[in-house]
Amino acid sequence: MSRTLKSNEPEDLAFARSFAAEGPRSQAAAGLVFFWAGLLYGLQTLTYGVVEAGGFALSASQGLALAIAPTVPFLAIVGFVGWRDRKAKKGVVTRTLNASYTSAGLINLIIALIFGWLATSRQSMVIWLLHPIVICAMQGAVWYAACAIRRKLWLGLVSAGWFVTTVALTLLITHITGYLLVLGAALLGLMAAPGFMMMRLAAREQGRE
């Protein structure tokens, strides 16, 4: 038994050193992406909710602009983060979190294609509205993984918020206005706000070094 513990000791120490050294850097990068994703797509979704509620109308060109507006700056931000960190050495913590985020992103892409094809072929908006519900559940799982790795209570609260949002959207799936407003609020409160907090915490930790 003692031999097993001794054999595991170097790996545990390596993980701890990697966590201390790379935590702020990986947290800042992820926070930047989450902040802008939540802000851009949250405002877009809330705008759709206001339109659906009859607040104002959009022309065809305005609707197209609103549909694609968040994507261009968001891709630019992702490209910037990838380019900035391209030569950075990645330890076990960064690789673990990156694998979690990347896996969720790939699953989200595949799910979007599947639900998009089904919604188009069946001419059913309800099928397409199931897509964000699944994405919210995935977000809950990703934030739970981050909570388990970093052992931070607030990450667990964000995870719980996403799971609550999943249930709320399921109940509102036939009430489009409420559905869009709740989803938009979740993107701002459970993605943009935590992303901003991650950047602030990373800056504070780096300032102590």
Question: Language model features by range: what are they?
Answer:
Residues 1-30:
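N-terminal juxtamembrane cytosolic/stromal segments of multi-pass membrane proteins
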Residues 25-114:
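Selected alpha-helical membrane-embedding segments in polytopic membrane proteins
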Residues 31-34, 38, 71, 106, ...:
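Residues within membrane-spanning alpha-helices of integral membrane proteins
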Residues 44-49, 107-119, 142-145, 162-175:
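Hydrophobic alpha-helical transmembrane segments and adjacent interfacial helices
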Residues 49-61, 116-129, 172-178:
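Helix-coil boundary and interhelical linker segments in multi-pass alpha-helical membrane proteins
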Residues 77-95, 141-148, 192-199:
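C-terminal ends of transmembrane helices
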Residues 96-155:
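Membrane-proximal helix-loop-helix units in multi-pass membrane proteins
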Residues 142-209:
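Terminal transmembrane helical module of multi-pass membrane proteins
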